[in-house]
Swiss-Prot record:
GO molecular function: aspartic-type endopeptidase activity; DNA binding; DNA-directed DNA polymerase activity; exoribonuclease H activity; lipid binding; RNA stem-loop binding; RNA-directed DNA polymerase activity; RNA-DNA hybrid ribonuclease activity
Ranges spanned by the short sequence motif Nuclear localization signal, renumbered to the chain: 26-32
Start-end of DNA-binding region: 1392-1439
Name recorded for this polypeptide: Gag-Pol polyprotein
Cofactor section: Mg(2+)
Record: residues binding Mg(2+) 1: D720, D795, D796
Sorted UniProt keywords: AIDS, Aspartyl protease, Capsid protein, DNA integration, DNA recombination, DNA-binding, DNA-directed DNA polymerase, Endonuclease, Eukaryotic host gene expression shutoff by virus, Eukaryotic host translation shutoff by virus, Host cell membrane, Host cytoplasm, Host endosome, Host gene expression shutoff by virus, Host membrane, Host nucleus, Host-virus interaction, Hydrolase, Lipid-binding, Lipoprotein, Magnesium, Membrane, Metal-binding, Multifunctional enzyme, Myristate, Nuclease, Nucleotidyltransferase, Phosphoprotein, Protease, Repeat, RNA-binding, RNA-directed DNA polymerase, Transferase, Viral genome integration, Viral nucleoprotein, Viral penetration into host nucleus, Viral release from host cell, Virion, Virion maturation, Virus entry into host cell, Zinc, Zinc-finger
Covalently attached lipid (N-myristoyl glycine), positions: G2
Keyword Protease: yes
Length: 1465
């Protein structure tokens, strides 16, 4: 380690490892801390050898000490470890870092007092970090060390001209001459923008210097002149002159310090540019800790770098002025000019107490005012409660305790046997419950009353005269959330006067009171005989009350309370009586708006906070038929993870989310734990992959992202549903399959087994069930408030309405109450009542919306993954920021690249990114949709073939977007415009349900001409055409018929694949010809060159015949933009022509000029290819009308020729060649439908996976005829699943009977819905087209249907495997049989491992996976390699273990033991 290892000797190293990092902490210093400190010294230009002595450490501390108050955490850590090393060198005994800092600072203060005062700066002693030093009475310049320059470069590169750069420059340039400073600037010269800013500041300051210090005139010979501005900047002065100006005896001019000040001004301007946050904008958030606010404040303050007096003023005024109201109140109480340490200490306990104050004030308000009418309260009975009803016999007039009838068996709540009332599933879960004493506690049923109030009750209270009629209503000694204060006090006094009875009911043990948290639990308590009302608050440590006197035996104490600190009196061992129990605890008295009992009293009372479980009905869940639950062993876990899982499981069990699995449960799923993002807490994960495989399928969860372009509403509120999964119960019959085992450390005891009672995370059904449950909960509320917009996405709910503030708040309150009543929690900290609302990446206001702040990443090295994320952010921003472009950035990651592959930026991509950054810096706002206002869409074309559009209502922009999908190298502007219109139409239909009026940059005539002949899209919305000034037009005029009397050019090109040499040329019908020799070309390029040659040499009107389908395809598309130079030349020439006819003729067989030109360009290049099978292929197509791939497969002709044959057929050229593709479904899945043609009924069945069809004409569309057809189909082909629409014939009993007898699962969809039975609907269309082609070959419709079915099954090739549907179906059946056979053969080789030896090596290797066992050898798989090993060199063992985790160190041990056993064998 060099000098790093010599910093401390062996003895001092031992002493270092005894010093603690923090007072009272467990962690101690290690040698790695010294190594880290050595590396950090380079940043400050300090030699690592300084750490080897006490004096050296003292020099380091002098440099670092002034920077510590405003420095970063790394700087403070470096200062701390240097203090510890200093104390070790000084032989000072220290226990921890704080002691070392005190001793080091004491030594620094003593040395400062000993230093003599000087009036002018002098050069430092030898060995300092200064370039000018005094040797023998003369000043000598030493160049800056590479370490100093390296530290400066590192500082700039790492901080990116952040606030730390300015103080870093001050420290590193101390004592430097202008020459040295220029050397530092040259080291970071690649930052051109920053350097230009600094140069401008230098020029301005130099001009000001020259104006303020005019030249005195000619100087005597030999006398040193006064420095000019350029001299200070080091451009017209030497190093010697700079030293003389700095250190001359009379009138020294500190040119170095002056130049440093200029550079600092420039750096400050750079910092402000790179870090635009102003010190005035640094304000503390309502819940932001004061320390975090101070860190941000000082970071921005360092960027200011103003005069120390100004900085001091900012600290004393702005720091306090911009704090939140709670901290500001505390800070003002500290008096004038408090120190930073005092401010941090005073605000340490405040983390947004304003919120706490509002909550407590709300609690007090709710306790003293009537509750609002809850949702659907009209369905609940009003009035007082009825008479007492016995739970045992059901009669009125007495309670169950007084009942003389025999005790009824089973639950008193629901009447069912098998459980008691305390465990009744219909009982509402209690939140706050006293722990049971003695036997199991009997818990009474508990639900909110009709008025929304909550009550407290014990079983013996009905005997005191309380009314408990209504079954679920529970009386209370005091009403906690409704009624007036007088009734609260009256009820409390009555309860106190009644004699206290023992809460014991027969043999059922102690019955504890329950407190629901639908409202805040306010109860009456007696403190040393003084009656008070208190709020039970489990979020507070201490208890504090007001308005009582407990004597003079107290301890003064200051606690963080509402609005700041509260002076209180703390009394210990005070007698408190609450809810029938007497305890002695510590309590404080002081000025508090509401009395609180905190955890110190609640724990003494035995109260716990219990999690609610939703009262929604569990969804029935089953395993797949014939499947069983997972039985996978738990893999070993580390001690740390076991303890973490134990704590998590115990907490979940207390909250009712888990329960202990019975010993008869045979199922198990592995569990493990990972660290959360903060690295302090653990998260439990269950590997539900096996359970997911055997669980039934669920509706696919389609969390469609809701847009924020909702209709404009007056008020908006956002609420969050917390822990939704854990609030919904799991089907009790399915819970057994979720069992998992928590192992014990060292297997000291059997693992504890649990099962889930709620929806577990990671299980496939949780999302679907949660979605379904939330919809059922919200549906009644939506119907009751039809004028309110409720958007739910995951656990975020947005409520928007035009109601008044009071009515809107009431709706929100009712929705929250409804969710709480159903068991869903709505955390207050995520409740957003006032704008702006943070929702789904947006900031919402009632009248406008914006995107949340978008920050583009800054990276040194860009990878493919980083580029993908950058494009995603830009695409997200494009919905509001017009002009966002990503074309050149996307080009950076074209091709097959790995995610971690490094990407080099091009100039165009960098320019595009910088342009996007400028766009994102501008403020953009969106508007909401207004009904009955016309919706408009304006399309614009930008450079580089990128399109932008905005959807607006008048001048209110609802949405903007971009389109840049250019799939072809050569494309047409009108075609792209059609795709843009298609995209806008789909978006508008989905979001607003209507098509906008389009403003398009094209003339209607141009559009109509292109659309008639060259349509290329599947769907275009209807619109009212409003053309803007045209930017798009058809570039040239292609005619459909040959031009009479004009010259005809026959073009051709050829290329030798080996030499890449080629020729291009043409021959005309008038005897002209021309050939051009090409090098390094291709056949396609040669064909294009020949076409361009003909265009160049021809008249304004010309006929051109080509034999290249490639050229014909490009010209027919009428491209206007291209990336190919030769195509660009063709476009340029075509624009000049008045009219051009382009024809295509396949091959060159006997076609006059085409054959001649082919012979002309083929000499020495290629052999002529005669396609003799064209005519048979054409005859085959005229007979069967097969598709392109069938012709290619059967006749071996090129695909271009086959495609032209199909396109030339007038019966097949209705809508071009279809794009073939098949949906690969299960082997036994068919779709069936009925269609009509010529008054006949045709029943069609399609095999989904292969496209094979069965079709015939049936006399009637009845269930009987359909059942007969289905039976005929099932007798020919394997069918297990039939999907149809819900027509009467398909839902008839006859069809269902056949399906049951054959064993077919039948599902239904919606008629004519493409998503329901899209395959058979499309096949009906193709079948009718095929019938139309063959109709003239048969008389009856029955015959032509069967002929068309034959052609579609045997004459239509394509899709998966390039097969016909008949070949594909037979292949699939055969493949399925082979798979089943091999699976049966290979099943016995599973779960076996093989250890083997190779060659003469006696060491056993493995284990490998057994693939096959033969008579003389075995085939094994080791990693990705397949090996054949003789039987005599292989040992086969059975593998009994389950899956293994990442930290199962036992696996390696087991493997090692197995190898040793195999070797000994």
């Amino acid at each position: 380690m060099g000098a790093r290892g010599s910093v401390l000797s062996g003895k001092k190293t031992d002493e270092l490892e005894k010093v603690r990092l923090r007072p009272g902490g467990k962690k101690k210093y290690m040698l790695k801390h010294v190594v880290w400190a050595v590396n950090e010294l380079d940043r400050f230009g300090l030699a690592e050898s300084l750490l080897e002595s006490k004096e050296g450490c003292q020099k380091i501390l002098k440099v670092l000490a002034p920077l510590v108050p405003t420095g970063s955490e790394n700087l403070k850590s470096l200062f701390n470890i240097v203090c510890v090393i200093f104390c070790l060198h000084a032989e000072e005994k220290v226990k921890d870092t704080e002691e070392a800092k005190k001793i080091a600072q004491r030594h620094l203060a003593a040395d400062t007092e000993k230093m003599p005062a000087t009036n002018k700066p002098t050069a430092p002693p030898s060995g300092g970090n200064y370039p000018v030093q005094q040797l023998a009475g003369n000043y000598v310049h030493l160049p800056l060390s590479p370490r100093t320059l390296n530290a400066w470069v590192k500082l700039v590169e790492e901080k990116k001209f952040g606030a730390e750069v300015v103080p870093g420059f001050q420290a590193l340039s101390e004592g430097c001459t202008p020459y040295d400073i220029n050397q530092m600037l040259n080291c970071v010269g690649e930052h051109q923008a920053a350097m230009q800013i600094i140069r401008e500041i230098i020029n301005e300051e130099a001009a000001d210097w020259d104006q303020q210090h005019p030249s005195p005139g000619p100087m005597p010979a030999g006398q040193l002149r006064d420095p000019r501005g350029s001299d200070i900047a080091g451009t017209t002065s030497t190093v010697e002159e700079q030293i003389q100006w700095m250190y001359r005896a009379q009138n020294p001019v500190p040119v170095g310090n002056i130049y440093r000040r200029w550079i600092q001004l420039g750096l400050q301007k750079c910092v402000r540019m790179y870090n635009p946050t102003n010190i005035l904008d640094i304000k503390q958030g309502p819940k932001e800790p004061f320390q975090s606010y101070v860190d941000r404040f000082y970071k921005s303050l360092r960027a200011e770098q103003t005069d120390p007096a100004v900085k001091n003023w900012m600290t004393q005024t702005l720091l306090i002025q911009n704090a939140n109201p709670d901290c500001k109140l505390v800070l003002k109480g500290l008096g004038m000019n408090p120190t930073l340490e005092e401010m941090l200490t005073a605000c340490q306990g405040i983390g947004g107490p304003g919120q706490k104050a509002r909550l407590m004030a709300e609690a007090l308000k709710e306790a003293l005012t009537p509750a609002p009418i809850p949702f659907a309260a009209v369905q609940q009975k009003a009035g007082k409660r009825g008479t007492v009803t016995c739970w045992n016999c059901g009669k009125q007039g007495h309670t169950a305790r007084q009942c003389r009838a025999p005790r009824r068996q089973g639950c008193w709540k629901c009447g069912k046997t098998g459980h008691i009332m305390s465990k009744c599933p219909e009982r509402q879960a209690g939140f706050l419950r006293v722990r049971t004493l003695g036997k199991e506690a009997s818990q009474l049923p508990h639900d909110p009353s009709a008025s929304g109030s909550d009550t407290i009750c014990t079983p013996d209270e009905p005997s005191r005269g309380h009314d408990t009629s209504g079954g679920d209503t529970i009386c209370a000694p005091c009403r906690s959330s409704s009624g007036d204060a007088e009734k609260l006090h009256a009820d409390g006094e009555t309860t106190e006067r009644e004699p206290r009875e023992t809460l014991q009911g027969g043999d059922r043990g102690f019955a504890a009171p329950q407190f629901s948290l639908w409202r805040r639990p306010v109860v009456k308590a007696c403190i040393e005989g003084q009656s008070v009302e208190v709020l039970l608050d489990t979020g507070v440590d201490d208890s504090i009350v007001a308005g009582i006197e407990l004597g003079s035996n107290y301890t003064p104490k200051i606690v963080g309370g509402i609005g700041g600190f509260i002076n209180t009196k703390e009394y210990k061992d005070v007698e408190i009586e609450v809810v029938g129990k007497r305890v002695r605890a510590t309590i404080m008295t002081g000025d508090t708006p509401i009395n609180i009992f905190g955890r110190n009293i609640l724990n003494t009372l035995g109260m716990t906070l219990n999690f609610p479980v939703a009262k929604v009905e569990p969804v029935k869940v089953e395993l797949k038929p014939g499947k069983d639950g997972p039985k996978i062993r738990q893999w070993p876990l580390s001690r740390e993870k076991i303890l973490a899982l134990k704590e998590i499981c115990e907490k979940m069990e207390k909250e009712g989310q888990l329960e202990e699995a019975p010993p008869t449960n045979p199922y198990n799923t592995p569990t493990f734990a990972i660290k959360k993002k903060d690295k302090n807490k653990w998260r439990m994960l269950i590997d539900f992959r096996e359970l997911n495989k055997v669980t039934q399928d669920f509706t696919e969860v389609n969390w469609v992202f809701p847009t924020r372009q909702v209709a404009e509403k007056r008020r908006i509120t956002v609420i969050d549903v917390g822990d939704a999964y854990f609030s919904i119960p799991l089907d009790p019959n399915f819970r057994q399959y979720t069992a998992f085992t928590l192992p014990s450390v060292n297997n000291a005891e059997p693992g504890k087994r649990y099962i889930y009672k709620v929806l577990p995370q990671g299980w496939k059904g949780s999302q679907s069930i949660c979605q379904y449950s939330m919809r059922k909960v919200l549906d009644p509320f939506r119907k009751a408030n039809s004028d309110v917009i409720i958007i739910q996405y995951m656990d975020d709910i947005l409520i928007a309405s035009d109601r008044s503030d009071l009515e809107h708040d009431r709706v929100v309150s009712q929705l929250k109450e409804l969710l709480n009543d159903m068991g869903f929690s709505t955390p207050e900290e995520k409740f957003q009542k006032d704008p702006p609302f943070k929702w789904m990446g947006y900031e919402l206001w009632p009248k406008k919306w914006k995107l949340q702040k978008i920050q583009l990443p800054e990276k040194e090295v860009w990878t493919v993954n980083a580029i993908q994320k950058l494009v995603g952010v830009l695409n997200w921003a494009a919905q509001l920021f017009p002009g966002i472009k990503t074309r050149h950035i996307c080009k950076l990651i074209r091709g097959k690249m790995t995610l971690t592959e490094e990407v080099q930026w091009t100039e165009l991509a960098e320019a595009e990114l910088q342009e996007n950054k400028i766009i994102l810096e501008q403020e953009q706002e969106g508007s909401y949709y207004k009904e009955r206002v016309p919706l408009e869409a304006t399309v614009q074309k930008n450079l580089a073939n990128q399109w932008t559009y905005k959807i607006h209502q008048g001048n209110k922009v609802l949405k903007v977007g971009k389109y840049a999908k250019v799939k072809n190298t050569h494309t047409n502007g009108v075609r792209l415009l059609a795709h843009v219109v298609q995209k806008i139409g789909k978006e508008a239909l989905v979001i607003w349900g209507e098509i906008p009026v389009f403003h398009l940059p094209v003339e209607r005539e141009t559009w109509d001409q292109w659309w008639t002949d060259y349509w290329q899209v599947t769907w275009i919305p209807e619109w009212d055409f409003v053309s803007t000034p045209p930017l798009i037009r058809l570039a040239y005029n292609l005619v459909k018929d040959p031009l009479e009397g004009r010259e005809t050019y026959y073009t051709d090109g050829s290329c030798n694949r080996t030499s890449k040499e080629g020729k291009a040329g043409y021959v005309t019908d008038r005897g002209k010809d021309k050939v051009k020799v090409l090098e390094q070309t291709t056949n396609q390029q040669a064909e294009l060159e020949a076409f361009a040659l003909a265009l160049t040499d021809s008249e304004p009107q010309v006929n051109i015949i080509v034999d290249s389908q490639y050229v014909m395809g490009i010209i027919a598309a009428q491209p206007t933009e291209t990336e190919s130079p030769i195509v660009a030349k063709i476009i340029e020439e075509m624009i000049k022509k008045e009219a051009v006819y382009v024809g295509w003729v396949p091959a060159h067989k006997g076609l006059g000029g085409n054959q001649e030109v082919d012979h002309l360009v083929s000499q020495g290049i290629r052999q002529v290819l005669f396609l003799e099978k064209i005519e048979p292929a054409q005859e085959e197509h005229e007979k069967y009308h097969g598709n392109v791939k069938e012709l290619v497969h059967k006749f071996g002709i090129p695909q271009l020729v086959a495609k032209q044959i199909v396109n030339s057929c007038d019966k097949c050229q209705q809508k071009g060649e279809a794009i073939h593709g098949q949906v690969n479904a299960d082997l036994g899945t068919w779709q069936m439908d009925c269609t009509h043609l010529e008054g006949k009924i045709i029943i069609v069945a399609v095999h989904v996976a292969s496209g094979f069809i069965e079709a015939e004409v049936i006399p009637q569309e009845t269930g009987r005829q359909t059942a007969l057809f289905l039976l005929k189909l099932a007798s020919r082909w394997p069918i297990t699943h039939l999907h149809t629409d819900n027509g009467a014939n398909f839902t008839s009993p006859s069809v269902k009977m056949v399906a049951w007898w054959v064993g077919i699962e039948q599902t239904f969809g919606v008629p004519y819905n493409p998503q329901s039975q899209g395959v058979v609907e499309a096949m009906n269309h193709h079948l009718k087209n095929q019938i139309d082609r063959l109709r003239d070959q048969a008389v009856s419709i029955e015959t032509v249907v069967l002929m068309a079915t034959h052609c579609m099954n045997f004459k239509r090739r394509g899709g998966i495997g390039d097969m016909t549907p008949a070949e594909r179906l037979v292949n699939m059946i055969t493949t399925e049989q082979e798979i089943q056979f091999f699976q049966a053969k290979n099943l016995k080789f599973q779960n076996f491992q093989v250890y083997y030896r190779e060659g003469r090596d006696q060491l056993w290797k493995g284990p490998g996976e057994l693939l096959w066992k033969g008579e003389g050898a075995v085939i094994i798989k080791v990693g990705t390699e397949i090996k054949v090993v003789p039987r005599r060199k292989a040992k086969i063992i059975r593998h009994y273990g389950g899956g293994k985790g990442l930290d199962c160190s036992a696996d390696m041990e087991d493997t090692r033991q197995a190898r040793e056993m195999a070797q000994s064998d």
